[in-house]
Regions:
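A short, N-terminal "cap"/entry segment at the start of jelly-roll beta-barrel domains
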Residues: 1-42
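Conserved short histidine dyad/triad with adjacent acidic residue
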Residues: 36-55, 89-92
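Short, conserved beta-strand element in jelly-roll/cupin
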Residues: 45, 54-70
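Short beta-strand His + acidic residue motifs that chelate non-heme Fe in jelly-roll/DSBH
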Residues: 52-53, 70-71, 88-89, 93-100
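Structural motif
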Residues: 60, 67, 94, 102-104
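Short acidic-glycine-tyrosine-enriched beta hairpin
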Residues: 74-91
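A short hydrophobic beta-strand segment most commonly corresponding to one strand
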Residues: 85-89, 100-109
């Protein structure tokens, strides 16, 4: 990832408009800021949320609250709780998120 020249700025995530994204089941709320090709998000999953697609995009994910299970298409899983992270490169391991109890994440991709 290359971060382009940009002035420093603070982001008050509580003031960033949330967009809703349906899961299978559940709901995700995304608060998104974009800097050229870099997307930075705070994402909240409802309890029982399962992503409705397999994702091949690379991410850096930090769990701020709750718990998620990152399911890989090969059947393996990573279980992460608050304070834990995972990272995956573009087109490496197709994955999707599941949150049995709900979660809040910080994601950069």
């Amino acid at each position: 990832m290359k971060i382009p020249a940009a002035p420093i700025r603070a982001i008050d995530w509580s003031k960033v408009e949330a967009t809703e994204h349906s899961g299978e089941p559940g709901m995700a709320l995304w608060r998104t800021e974009q800097l050229c090709d870099i997307r930075v998000r705070v994402v909240e999953y409802s309890a029982g949320y399962i992503a409705n697609h397999w994702c091949a995009k690379g991410h850096v994910v930090l769990v701020l609250a709750g718990e998620i299970i990152s399911q890989q298409r090969d059947g393996s899983e990573l279980r992460l709780s608050a304070g834990m992270s995972y990272l995956v490169g573009d087109d490496c391991d197709a994955h999707r998120s599941y949150s049995p109890t709900g979660a809040k994440l910080f994601i950069v991709d």
